[in-house]
Amino acid sequence: MAGVSAAWELSRAGWEDRFASITLYQRGWVLGGKGASTRADDGRILEHGLHVWLGYYDNAFRLVRECYAELDRTRSDPTCPIRTWQDAFTPAPDVGVFEHRGSATGTWVARFGTNELVPGEAAPDPDLGTLIRRGAALAADLVRSSRERPGVRVDAAVDLVTTVLRGMSADGLLRPGGGGFAAVDHLDFRTWLLHHGAAPETVDGGLVRGMYDLVFGYRRGDRTQPAFSAGLGVFLAVRMFLDYKGAIFWKMTAGMGDVVFAPLHQALDRRGVGLRYFHRVDALRTDDGGARLAAVELTRQVPGRVVDGYDPLVRVGDLPCFPSRPLADGLGEHCPTEAEPWPSSGGRVSLEIGRDVDEVVLAVGLGAVPLVAADIVAEQPRWRAMIEHVRTVPTRSAQLWLRDDEATLGWAHPGATVSGLDAPFDTCASMTHLLAAEGGEPDRAPRALAYLCSALPEGAPPVTETTEAFLNGWADALWPRGGPKSLEDERLHAHHTSTNTDPSDRYVQSLPGSSQHRLRADGSGVAHLVLAGDWIDCGLNAGCIEAATISGIQAAAVIEGRPLSDRVLGPLTWDAA
């Protein structure tokens, strides 16, 4: 998303007066990075993992809203089922945690109140008094929506919110000169909560554990080693619970590739941005002792003449989507195969600074940085420190299509997203609403859909084995009236698993003390090289699409000589001076 966001910002109206060309290079045939999704031959959505958008993702929502407004599908593509951003996203106010109380377990799902605010629209930054009033309103919402006595679990949520507000005030995190949230980045979130008076039951409970699950906050993916920056924890608690717009969560009504990246591909193409698929970045070459970028070395995976004419999208139910396999009729004999999934029949390409390009935005995933920028990492201590301290973790996910509906299965919370489960998957989301976008024969189609995800510990068995183990151990808890107990269970219509170990697919963590080692968009130390990605210091130092979007906005600002904060929505108080 970071590179797409930068291209979007740079290609605003009149860009031809500022630049000769803008070109985005993408490995393979699918745009979107960790947010990419495709469609199987039968129309099923295949994701990297579970994606929900939080209600404070103003910059990401603004980008999507601008994209849909520009495409104007109501006029230009009236048969498309998703024509506006409101068609693409639906509020998801039901959020829960799975609780472990001694030998007893149970699911607590609360309905967070919705509001009339619109994500992506500018709004005044809330002060502490406003946050306190919102916290009181949130507590009342939770009491009203809980199916239990208020004292059983709601008190933990109230304790969390009040502790965060009390601690923010005590530490002066919103006070000018207080250092912002970066002042407590060196602490673990749980440690900080205890220091400011949170009950141990709250800190060890499902709600806090769910926040760690949300950011895959476990060293090396090991759930016995929770680690999550207090700076980000406080920032996230405030923005997620007290500063959301419309709803706390928003879910997409089709795959993320369908509703975000396919429209962006279309809009960027319409703007005249060059979209060069099948290009893998191999290396950044420098000169002047590493102070200046000299060239970008790429491998062209198919011949250039094929790239020039390749259209990556197909229509599923009249919705433009990326296919799970490259389109053979567009590539001919150059189509990747199982024997050679990443061919290099197009040869190598060298983009020379001053001859082919003037400025470069590096927007690969952090895991790929040591590979493509090996010389820079070797030459610059700040890059080495970033690679050492800003860590990544692989993730795993499973999608389960079920033959019975959720009521028959006994799942009492349609549409809910629940965290705090135990290994091997810590989060389960009801995604049955996506079945309408997948189509299929009504008499044979699945009737429920669940997404599972978690960090992937070192040495973990294959995800198919862990999914099998999960169903065997957790089916009764999730679907007490009879869910599938194995991948071969006839109650399971289909399944799809994903192990995200590719360097660019690894999730960027926010471990205590790591933010100080992130580089800013303008901080590469290499002339002609600007940085973008959810791994840079962008003011929201978290692995999420909002951070990636902000980083792209900032990268564009650097290239155009504008302040980093220009066009960034939301409070930039991470390191307030």
Predicted regions and their residues:
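Active-site/ligand-binding neighborhood in enzyme catalytic cores
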Residues: 147-347, 352
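A short, Lys/Arg-enriched amphipathic alpha-helix followed by its capping loop at the start of a domain
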Residues: 6-20, 267-273
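Dinucleotide-binding Rossmann-like beta1-alpha1 core, especially the glycine-rich loop
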Residues: 42-152
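Glycine-rich FAD pyrophosphate-binding loop
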Residues: 11-40
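Short, solvent-exposed loop/turn and secondary-structure capping segments
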Residues: 33-37, 223, 227, 371-376, ...
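N-terminal Rossmann-fold NAD(P) dinucleotide-binding loop
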Residues: 3
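C-terminal segments that line or cap access tunnels to active or ligand-binding sites in enzymes
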Residues: 176-178, 184, 235-266, 279, ...
